Structure formats: structure tokens, C-alpha cells
A protein has these predicted regions:
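Soluble extramembrane regions of membrane proteins in the secretory/endomembrane system
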Residues: 162, 169, 173-178, 190
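Solvent-exposed helix-loop boundary motif
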Residues: 22-34, 38-170, 196-218, 222, ...
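Boundary at the C-terminal end of the N-terminal hydrophobic targeting segment
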Residues: 18-20
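Extended alpha-helical scaffolding regions
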Residues: 106, 241-363, 367
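Extended, compositionally biased alpha-helical segments that mediate assembly or anchoring
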Residues: 310-470
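Conserved small/polar residues in nucleotide/adenosyl-binding loops
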Residues: 560-567
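Bacterial N-terminal signal peptides that target proteins for export
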Residues: 1-10
């Protein structure tokens, strides 16, 4: 019998003796249990890729339990019902109606599923600092068994070394005993939701007043801001450490409890009057979803300056629906394009992070679209024809619609070809229009703050974004203008449905490939004209050359840059 099992048995016996002498102190979920989950479990049991959808970052997630249905599935023919924690159901019964089953409840004379999983792991501990047994499969692509309580015995027999925590040295004896005592007592959860401090409450009210101000112009700006900040973990100037908030749509106004409008996408029809509310982020903070954005007096002043300083008007508020989702340039055309672009430039690191670290970029299929390392630059608004030339903007806007709204599996090819051709028509329009403009140079790049230069690093099946140009000059660079930055954000963050079917996901990722190509071609226009074909030949080799011929609009190799740009970057 392993020494560790003997020790834990002795401790369990000792705790029983102590219990006979007097009641042990009550175990608190918040004080005693969540810290164990945070230290030992959330690395695998958080976010959409929680094993078996068992999210142990909060009491709500632990109570919700597990499901055999994975969130990430690039082959399903029908979209599945969303199962976003805190959004799509509340309480154990509601989640069980969506296919979840308890891991905390005892089953007759049998202990809770979690207790049995922990016991299996504790009974067969792994040797520290030794190679894992070959029979333990790991990785994002591993097939999780997700046994229900009645299936546990069969699971334990087939996978005797795959108790919990999986493939690590596991819990300390004290942690194990604490969890088992808690489960044996019925797994009570005393977790209280985070609440804003008095100072935060004042700032919450100020921001909610701004986004819920009356008037058509105010309503349109609020909708645009919400759609651009819904993923952010917001924090206040002078706020409490560890307190973050997120924008949500509610049926109730400020001052009343939030009645969440939980549509699949942030730009779906709410079906009722909308109030934009700030909701405290609940549960353990994990890196994958922690894309931060500060709220301050300076930020509010900047929003007011950008969006409310002009005399532009809204004649009619746009509705909702597939066409409105597909083309935000038409949906929000009443808002000055310069204001929209400048807001995104001011916060470029945040926006690039939303689509580089968001749900669309989980797994090799998505990150295969991008290269291992590249730099991102941005075109200055005063040199962006979409901002400065209303006639060009009017021609370009209908061509900027994005696919993915129609998820009919049988129509994937025809939809893809239609949107590819529309995108290439836009690229031809852009190429010809810029040919009549002053030659581009490095001075046409935006350099307004420290968001102006970004480095992106791909780590096989995930990616990260950092300010500054880091490392040696990469093989490729991306140059965003407003139409490209906005399309990237909407295609990969706003409109992407992680619960969508194979058609939706394929259209999204195929268009992402066109986005990458467009950003690379934008950058090449800064290079000496005679060198562009050589760069393309280096960037697109083997099957890439066929793809260039089949899907991409050709690069302009005749339009010369200014003398300053012809000096190049030494790439």
C-alpha cells in the first residue's frame, strides 16, 4: 500500500477521533474550497475548454456540474444551445435541463462523483518528477470520458490512473481531506457575488448614465460602444484590487437588479428595450478571458470628444438581423467613421487581443491562419480613404459585408465564393483608388500612443499580443486600416459563435484567411514596388501559391511609394 495512502488514512482516522471529541469547524466554500480549486483545478477546468464543461472557477460552476457535450466542436452539423456560465441558466435544476449532471451530490449510498474521482486520484498517486505513464492521454484533442455517476465504476476500471487532479502530483493530504469532508457534508456553497465598492458604484452610475442617455444619436453610440467592449474586463480608476466589470444588456434600468438579455451574440435582436449595465465579473480570473480595459474620467472625456463633439445626426436607428450583423459599416454609418476608427486605434492592443486570444483562436485549425510571429501597424486616419473620402466610403461599404450569418451546411461553398468575390472586388477598388492618392510612406502610419506598434506571437494552438516591436524583424507584417480592423474584430469577436456549426465556423476561418492576406498586402504597399513580388514569393510557397491564384486579389506592383518608404525596413 503506498505510503501516501497510509498517511491520508491515518489523518482521516485522526479527524474522526477529533470529531468524536467535538465538532470540527464548519468548512466554508469561499474560504476553504475555492482556493483549492483555484490552485489545483482551474488550469484545466475554466473557460469554454473546461474538461467536460466542469468549470471550477466559482461555486456556480461547481454546482452546475459536468456535461458530455463539448463546446469546441468543428464538425457538428447543427448549432448547439449555448451554455455560458452565469448567462444561459441559473441554478442546478436549470443546468440539468441543458444536459448537465451533478458532481457534488451523493447518489444513494454512493459518494458524490467528485469525491470518487478524487479518491481514485489519491489512491494511485503519480511519482513526482517522473515521466507520466504512457496510458494517460493529454492535450486539447484528448477524448474526455465525462462519466456520469452510474458510469464511474466502469471508468475507474478502464482508467485506474486517471483520477483527479489528472496527470499531476495532486492534492496535499490536507487538501484532500478538506474536500472530502466538504463533499460528505453535502457540498454547501456560501459564495457571495462580488459587489462594487462605494467609489466603484459612483463610477458605475456615471458610465451607465452615459450609455443609457436618451436620444437617437446617444442610443446608436451606446450600441456601438457596447458591441466593442462586451468582451472587456473593465476596471475603474481607484477601484478595488481584483474587481472587474463587464458590459451586459439588461431589461432593467440602473438602480434595479440586472435582468440579463442573454442572446447568442452581442448584436442579436434583444427583443425588448435595452439598458446597458455594468455587471461585476464573477469567479476566478483566468488569463484566456482576462482582456482588460480601464474606465476613468479621461476615458469618458475621450468618448465624449470623439462621438459627441460634432453635429452629426441619426435619422433612424438601425434594426437587428443577419444583414445588420454582416455589415457593421452600414449599421453604424451615421456615426462618423473617424470617431469609430480613432476609438479603436486608441485601444488597439485591446482590440487585437479580443480576436487573437478570443474563442475563435483556440486550436490549431484557427491559429494555422496566422504566422508564428508578426508585427501589426496601423494606417493613420488622415491617410485612410475610408475616413477622408465620402465617395470612396460609399462605394466600399456594400463590399465589406462578412460571412457566417447563414449557417446552412449545404451552402458553404456558394456563400464562401460570394463573399470572397465581394472582398476581392473591394481590394481592387482600394488598390485603384489609392493609386490616385499621394504615395504612401512610413509617415502615413499612426503613431498616436503606445498601442501603435504591436507584436503577435503564436504558440501552436493559441496566440498572444504585446505592445512594441519585439524580437528580430519577422517574415511578415500586418498593416490595418479602418475597414480591415473593424472587419477583423466583427468577424472573429462579435459575430463568431463558438457554439455554431461547421458551416459557421468554416466561413469564419476562411474569411480570416482573407483578412490576413489583406493586412499583409496593405503592408507590402509600403515596400518598394519592384520588391513586392519577391516578398510574396517568400511568404506564399508551395500550396500558398495556388491559394494566391485561386482566392486572393493580386498585389499592385506598379504603384511606387515615396522615397522614404522605398528605403524599406530592411526586411
Amino acid at each position: 500500500m503506498p505510503f501516501r495512502f497510509i498517511v491520508s488514512s491515518a489523518l482521516l482516522l485522526l479527524s474522526s477521533v477529533c470529531l468524536a471529541q467535538g465538532p470540527a469547524p464548519a468548512i466554508s466554500y469561499t474560504r476553504d474550497i475555492q482556493p483549492i480549486f483555484t490552485e489545483k483545478c482551474v488550469a484545466c477546468h475554466a473557460c469554454y475548454d473546461s474538461a467536460c464543461q466542469l468549470n471550477l472557477g466559482s461555486g456556480e460552476g461547481a454546482s452546475r456540474g459536468a456535461s458530455k457535450i463539448p463546446v469546441y466542436d468543428g464538425e457538428r452539423s447543427k448549432a448547439q444551445a449555448p451554455t455560458r456560465l452565469f448567462y444561459d441558466a441559473t441554478g442546478q435544476r436549470a443546468w440539468q435541463q441543458k444536459g448537465f449532471y451533478s458532481v457534488l451530490d451523493a447518489q444513494g449510498s454512493q459518494a458524490a462523483l467528485m469525491a470518487r474521482m478524487l479518491e481514485l486520484g489519491h489512491r494511485t498517486p503519480l511519482q513526482p518528477n517522473a515521466k507520466l505513464p504512457s496510458e494517460i492521454a493529454l492535450g486539447l484533442s484528448r477524448e474526455n470520458m465525462c462519466p456520469q455517476p452510474a458510469e464511474f465504476d466502469a471508468y475507474a476500471g478502464a482508467h485506474p490512473k486517471e483520477g483527479m487532479p489528472l496527470a499531476v502530483t495532486g492534492l496535499t493530504d490536507q487538501q484532500y481531506l478538506t474536500l472530502q469532508r466538504w463533499l460528505a457534508s453535502g457540498a454547501p456553497i456560501d459564495e457571495q457575488g462580488l459587489a462594487p465598492s462605494a467609489r466603484e458604484s459612483l463610477q458605475v452610475a456615471q458610465w451607465e448614465n452615459l450609455l443609457n442617455a436618451p436620444g437617437a444619436r446617444e442610443s446608436l453610440v451606446a450600441r456601438w460602444l457596447y458591441e466593442h467592449l462586451f468582451l472587456a474586463h473593465l476596471y475603474f480608476e481607484g477601484g478595488e484590487p481584483g474587481h472587474f466589470f463587464q458590459w451586459v444588456r439588461s431589461r432593467t434600468p440602473s438602480g434595479q437588479p440586472i435582468d440579463l438579455i442573454n442572446t447568442r451574440r452581442p448584436n442579436d435582436d434583444p427583443g425588448t428595450q435595452v439598458y446597458y449595465r455594468l455587471w461585476p465579473v464573477q469567479g476566478v480570473i483566468v488569463h484566456k478571458t482576462h482582456i482588460t480595459y480601464p474606465l476613468s474620467a479621461a476615458k469618458m472625456a475621450r468618448v465624449k470628444t470623439l462621438f459627441y463633439s460634432g453635429d452629426w445626426q441619426v435619422t433612424a436607428l438601425p434594426g437587428y438581423g443577419p444583414a445588420r450583423r454582416a455589415n457593421p459599416f452600414e449599421t453604424f454609418e451615421a456615426i462618423p467613421a473617424k470617431a469609430r476608427y480613432q476609438f479603436m486605434l486608441d485601444n488597439a492592443e485591446y482590440f487585437v487581443r479580443t480576436f487573437i486570444r478570443g474563442p475563435v483562436c483556440r486550436g490549431q485549425i484557427a491559429t494555422d491562419v496566422i504566422r508564428d510571429n508578426f508585427w501589426a501597424l496601423f494606417q493613420a486616419p488622415e491617410h485612410d480613404l475610408y475616413i477622408t473620402d465620402p465617395a470612396y466610403r460609399g462605394q466600399a461599404t456594400p463590399l465589406l459585408a462578412m460571412p457566417g450569418q447563414n449557417d446552412d451546411v449545404g451552402s458553404v461553398l456558394s456563400l464562401w465564393l460570394a463573399y470572397r468575390d465581394k472582398r476581392n472586388e473591394y481590394e481592387a477598388l482600394r488598390r485603384d483608388s489609392y493609386a490616385d492618392s499621394p504615395a504612401p510612406s512610413w509617415s502615413t502610419l499612426w503613431a498616436g500612443n503606445d498601442n501603435a506598434l504591436l507584436s503577435i506571437f503564436r504558440h501552436f494552438d493559441s496566440a498572444s499580443v504585446t505592445k512594441g516591436l519585439i524580437g528580430e524583424v519577422p517574415q511578415t507584417m500586418w498593416l490595418f486600416d479602418y475597414p480591415l480592423l473593424e472587419r477583423t474584430y466583427y468577424q472573429l469577436a462579435v459575430n463568431f459563435d463558438v457554439f455554431g456549426n461547421v458551416s459557421h465556423q468554416a466561413q469564419t476561418r476562411l474569411y480570416f484567411d482573407l483578412i490576413r492576406n489583406g493586412a499583409e498586402q496593405n503592408f507590402l504597399r509600403l515596400m518598394p514596388a519592384g520588391t513586392r513580388e519577391d516578398f510574396l514569393d517568400d511568404w506564399y510557397q508551395n500550396s500558398g501559391k495556388f491559394k494566391m491564384w485561386l482566392d486572393y486579389e493580386s498585389i499592385d506592383c506598379l504603384l511606387y511609394t515615396s522615397d522614404a518608404a522605398d528605403e524599406g525596413l530592411g526586411v
